[in-house]
Amino acid sequence: MDLKFSHVDVLVNNLEEACAYYAQVLNARISKTLIWERGGLHVRYAIALIGQERFMLVQPLAGNLKELLDASGEGMIYRHCYSTPDIEKAYDELMAAGVQPEDENGKPLARANLQSPSGARIIWLPKRFGHFSIEILEDKALEAFVEAAFS
């Protein structure tokens, strides 16, 4: 599978405070605030860009990530994200390897349903290491999404 590292997702209690900290202490560029809401999951998030490195600062409001934040606390890196030039090929390769891609709530994801509320096509691998997850996004859509987040 053709993958490259994209970013990590970090849980925060207060998005504005976390963004201010990353901007002040790490000289990060901060995107506009974005919303993800689907299937009981509701989060506010922003991209912190430090040089070429990206962090998604995620404030969960409802759903499994809110439960994880309440149980584990702020600052937890709960996801590594990778990008690929061909998300359908990645999906097919995972299925051929016996790995059923999932949606953001851990439910089986059909190849026809790769679209997300952010506009990017995304798949998640089943969680095999506690609460840690791996996400795969399509290159072109990811880069367009990041560019729009900073416009």
Which positions does each model-derived feature cover?
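Core segments of cupin and vicinal oxygen chelate
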Residues: 2-3, 10-54, 90, 96-115, ...
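Hydrophobic, ordered structural segments
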Residues: 74-84, 97-102, 121, 126-147
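Short acidic, gly/pro-rich beta-turn/loop elements at beta-sheet edges
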Residues: 20, 58, 67, 90-92, ...
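Vicinal oxygen chelate
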Residues: 4-13, 46-49, 68-93, 126
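Conserved short beta-strand elements that form part of the metal-binding/catalytic scaffold
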Residues: 29-71, 114-141
